[in-house]
Amino acid sequence: MALLPFTLPLAELEVGHHLYWQIGNLNLHGQIFLSSWILIGALLAFVLVGTKNLSRDPKGAQNLLEFLWDYIRDLSRDQIGEKYYREWLPFIGTLFLFIFVSNWGGALIPWKVIELPEGELGAPTADINTTVAMALLVTLAYFYAGLSKKGWRFFELYVEPTPIMLPFKIIEEFTKPLSLSFRLFGNILADELAVGVLVYLVPLIVPLPVMLLGLFTSAIQALIFATLAAFYIGEGLHEAH
């Protein structure tokens, strides 16, 4: 018996047009792969430039990279703890940098210059597939962290302080990736749509404040995602966090 008088396939819900790559029976969003690798390539190039001639008196790209490293290190240490944060620092740093570069790249890079057969390039984090994939990756990291350090005792936290908490703890595990993915996706997509509408209606001065606000929001969203990822991992590692 159907609960609704219509069907609503989630896979058919889209915003805008997309370039698809057909691999067997699987449809891949081609423009997301393209924009992701362009941004990853730009990030790697910046890192290579910043670490080419290391100096004790850092300047330019090296100075910025060292600032980011110190910031991510402090964030990871605060959320995960002094004992375990070093082994998770590359993971948290990669998440933060990819999201930050993706968010800012979607706002600053003139993607429309690159023409595609269908659809257009944009911020990878404005696509729900990207944010859900990263949220699930954080969830897997959370379970791996807990099981690798505590073994099966990890699941004791689901019945602490009382077994009555079990259903609530299970629901919480589903809400974690949902909140991570939809918060990031919704904010970045809304920013892109707002800027796009304003540029179309008032193409000169008015969109600039909104674009600047979008850059600030994009940086905050990267920070929130990385902080929550580190917190969840720390929660899985410690008896009480």
From Swiss-Prot:
Name of the featured protein: ATP synthase subunit a
Subunit structure: F-type ATPases have 2 components, CF(1) - the catalytic core - and CF(0) - the membrane proton channel. CF(1) has five subunits: alpha(3), beta(3), gamma(1), delta(1), epsilon(1). CF(0) has four main subunits: a, b, b' and c.
Organism: Synechococcus sp. (strain CC9311)
Topology with respect to the bilayer: Multi-pass membrane protein
Cellular localisation: Cellular thylakoid membrane
Gene Ontology CC terms, in alphabetical order: plasma membrane-derived thylakoid membrane; proton-transporting ATP synthase complex
CDD domains per record: ATP-synt_Fo_a_6
Lineage: Bacteria, Bacillati, Cyanobacteriota, Cyanophyceae, Synechococcales
Keywords: ATP synthesis, CF(0), Hydrogen ion transport, Ion transport, Membrane, Thylakoid, Transmembrane, Transmembrane helix, Transport
Keyword Membrane part of the UniProt annotation: yes
PANTHER family given in the database record: ATP SYNTHASE SUBUNIT A, CHLOROPLASTIC (PTHR42823:SF3)
Primary role: Key component of the proton channel; it plays a direct role in the translocation of protons across the membrane.
Gene3D superfamilies reported in the protein's UniProt record: ATP synthase, F0 complex, subunit A (1.20.120.220)
Disulfide bond entries: none
Gene from which this protein is expressed: atpB
